[in-house]
Amino acid sequence: SGQMKIAPEHTQDRVLKYMGKPGSKSLVAFKDMFNKLNKAAGKKQFLTYYLIAAHPGCTLEDMKQLKIFTSKELRMHPEQVQIFTPLPSTVSAVMYYTQEDPFTGRTLFVEKDRAKRQQQKDVIVAGKRHGKGRVRR
């Protein structure tokens, strides 16, 4: 299909640490290598990104920074972002329910308000839905 979907899930290093992911420099290095190899092979392939809003430790400001990063560093504007859902037996679920970093015991910001979780997502996708779910007048 000419595309590869990867799951950086976020771009802010602090949030990535809570997700157990490498920092944003790894993502940029991978993207650059992918583009270089495509160009050398004469291919027109591209990356799509799986991103998550409202993960434990993620704030509205982190989502604003994600939007800036994807625009400037990745040169793309995400159309899909998933809102974090805690899954059983995961470290992220422990963080969500305890509101603590299980490795340090420190209090962790966790957005649990449904509207504010949606707001984190909307920072990225607002204006892209063109009225889906709403009546245009």
Task: List the model feature ranges, each with a label.
Residues 61, 77-137:
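C-terminal accessory regions of radical SAM enzymes
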Residues 1-77, 83:
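Conserved AdoMet/S-adenosylmethionine-binding subsite of the radical SAM
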